[in-house]
């Protein structure tokens, strides 16, 4: 397909490759090789690692995480090579301050996984690294895909899309993010669209002061463009038969932060100690990613055991929430779901929990649902993420007669949230950095003169540098978070015995409710769930139990097997979800509501007001991770990764425009921008 062929923004076009007589992949679009026919690995090491003074710089580096930016991912050769060298460095210098390598790369036309595997056969010495990359290589969905490898020692942010669109979407503060640039890609003569002043300026914008840069080309316009952007560039000897290449350093940073002040995100310097309030899957995911970064984590759970709230169900469906628009909803949930699969699969290597990647089938059970799902399919997502099924295919996939059309999420499935949450906490308990406080209900948050947070129970007070409120609908317990515009939603899920017909259900079935396949260990299914806004009653309701069964029979009215669903033994579980008006979570700094209301009262007079605009007022060191709703299993892992990245000052794996859609102050800001009162 031509590189100029324009598709909807939810779609990314895979590269079309041919293989030359040397077995090297060649791009059809650019008529250029992905790496040198001769000694491609050695060329990578010379051009990009050695000319960026690696690994020597790592020995002298005094920060926790070193960040490399790359302009063309291709087959991942540069990434694999630097991964190999960094792992050797960590082995040789285990006590060095530098613990983690973060690699940020861009690719407009990602190679397919099968082509990736074939290309990697050229470098057998990199096989152990290549296999891990292949295992978690993402579907062709736009924006950032985070891969966490080597238990957090290696992080890859792989941005799918045009680099000129992606680079400005990376959240950045005044200090910049990148320590070294690998300016790679097809030759400037083959890909002139990429090699331009916009690229060079964006590289400088994302770079820290002292950031180095190296590229294989010695083209004069590239050297002049990088110098104009602020890099001090020099010619150096090229690799092998190539006479010259260029390398250099950014001597001064002039670029400022790249986000609106009312969507600012801040953190405290050198955070080493974080408290998390809440005992569910959100807290478990966040604790996991913070511990990987060497942070001391204390989780406070009000119940005798974790996962007693909304994360306590026996079976929960895992699939993305998508729409046809290229907006915050799809742009978060598509990569969020892909990352959730990675997180859960990695957890399964050391945590035991019931789960089955059997797929999720969503029925077009009436005209409204059919219109909604057909509209969603116009988003042109890859089939690997979601596909359309006719009646025959639906019946075949479900394993029971349905006789209606559907959409199918082949990567989806179900898992036991309670087992996953408790298993993650149990695994973390082996780490001296982690403490789980059960039976510890926090009743108040206060900040002392040293800007430390005090968490008070009835009998104790605990002091921490930073706090994350992740306690679902109980966010109203605290003065600082009580005004967040979120709604509690009661849900009752029924546990039903399997039958000869229900045993045939092969996939999670979604309609105006959901039914899971049998958990063979217990010979039961879950069917649900009721949805009662602002209802906090945790008592069992027989009417909800009956309704859970009737909802399936209403949506699949012409088949016999739904009559086998028997909820009469009243086995059920009630939980309270927490939801936002726009169906997106809140993650980030907790906003000082009254101060923001006063500071931003004239925000709608934007032109005049912006002259004196200040960052949105927040509680320093106080964060939230709330309103995951009924999609917490699909969203919590990436939300945790994004929030941990913000807290620790790492690159954030979400576009700026999506981060705006997740900001805890967004609903207030939107009203103020329109000159409306804050009555939400």
From Swiss-Prot:
Name of a matching Pfam family: Methyltransf_30
EC number: 2.1.1.61, 1.5.-.-
GO molecular function: flavin adenine dinucleotide binding; oxidoreductase activity, acting on the CH-NH group of donors; tRNA (5-methylaminomethyl-2-thiouridylate)(34)-methyltransferase activity
Listed SUPFAM superfamilies: FAD/NAD(P)-binding domain
Biological function: Catalyzes the last two steps in the biosynthesis of 5-methylaminomethyl-2-thiouridine (mnm(5)s(2)U) at the wobble position (U34) in tRNA. Catalyzes the FAD-dependent demodification of cmnm(5)s(2)U34 to nm(5)s(2)U34, followed by the transfer of a methyl group from S-adenosyl-L-methionine to nm(5)s(2)U34, to form mnm(5)s(2)U34.
Catalytic activity: 5-aminomethyl-2-thiouridine(34) in tRNA + S-adenosyl-L-methionine = 5-methylaminomethyl-2-thiouridine(34) in tRNA + S-adenosyl-L-homocysteine + H(+)
Species classification: Bacteria, Pseudomonadati, Pseudomonadota, Gammaproteobacteria, Vibrionales
GO cellular component, one term: cytoplasm
InterPro entries: FAD-dep_OxRdtase, FAD/NAD-bd_sf, MnmC-like_methylTransf, SAM-dependent_MTases_sf, tRNA_MAMT_biosynth_bifunc_MnmC, tRNA_MNMC2, tRNA_S-uridine_synth_MnmC_C
Subcellular location: Cytoplasm
Top-level lineage group: Bacteria
Region (tRNA (mnm(5)s(2)U34)-methyltransferase): 1-251
Cofactor: FAD
Protein name from the UniProt record: tRNA 5-methylaminomethyl-2-thiouridine biosynthesis bifunctional protein MnmC
Family: In the N-terminal section; belongs to the methyltransferase superfamily. tRNA (mnm(5)s(2)U34)-methyltransferase family.
Example of a GO biological process term: methylation
Gene3D superfamilies, per the entry: D-Amino Acid Oxidase, subunit A, domain 2, FAD/NAD(P)-binding domain, Vaccinia Virus protein VP39
Alphabetical keyword list: Cytoplasm, FAD, Flavoprotein, Methyltransferase, Multifunctional enzyme, Oxidoreductase, S-adenosyl-L-methionine, Transferase, tRNA processing
Gene name of this polypeptide: mnmC
Region named FAD-dependent cmnm(5)s(2)U34 oxidoreductase: 277-680
